[in-house]
């Protein structure tokens, strides 16, 4: 699990390989990741959007952005956390993801971002 904290927003990430979706003939690699976002600030914030950078080892970086996460734009009051699980498909056996969540301070209306820490996506056979 990896963690980071930016401007009072703490983000934790864990990831795992989806062996149940893998076939050697298909040669695509599926991973899930769980994100937990904690509001360590003294005021409420709303998650507006996300920006992901997905590194496919030896094949470059793709960027994915969009509104909210898993169809939601959660509001987090001070001390509250929000968790969700999502997935990623790689065209190679190893990669990495990192990015940013964009928030609005619901007290001042100020917009800001929090970094999503980099985390590895590795086909487990490569670790043996």
Model-derived regions: residue spans:
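Asparagine-centered strand-capping/turn motif at beta-strand->loop junctions
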Residues: 37-41
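Intrinsically disordered, low-complexity Pro/Gly/Ser/Thr-rich segments with frequent PxxP/GP/PP motifs
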Residues: 62-94
């Amino acid at each position: 699990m990896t963690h980071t904290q930016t401007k009072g927003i703490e983000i934790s990430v864990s990831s795992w390989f989806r062996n149940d979706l893998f076939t050697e003939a298909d040669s695509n690699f599926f991973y899930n990741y769980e994100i937990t976002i904690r509001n360590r600030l003294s005021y409420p914030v709303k998650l507006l959007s996300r920006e992901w950078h997905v590194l496919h080892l030896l094949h470059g970086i793709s960027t994915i952005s969009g509104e909210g996460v898993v169809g939601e734009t959660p509001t987090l009051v001070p001390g509250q956390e929000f968790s969700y699980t999502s997935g990623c498909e790689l065209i190679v056996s190893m990669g990495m993801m990192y990015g940013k969540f964009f928030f609005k301070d619901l007290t001042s209306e100020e917009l800001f971002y929090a970094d999503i820490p980099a985390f590895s996506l590795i086909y487990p056979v490569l670790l043996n």
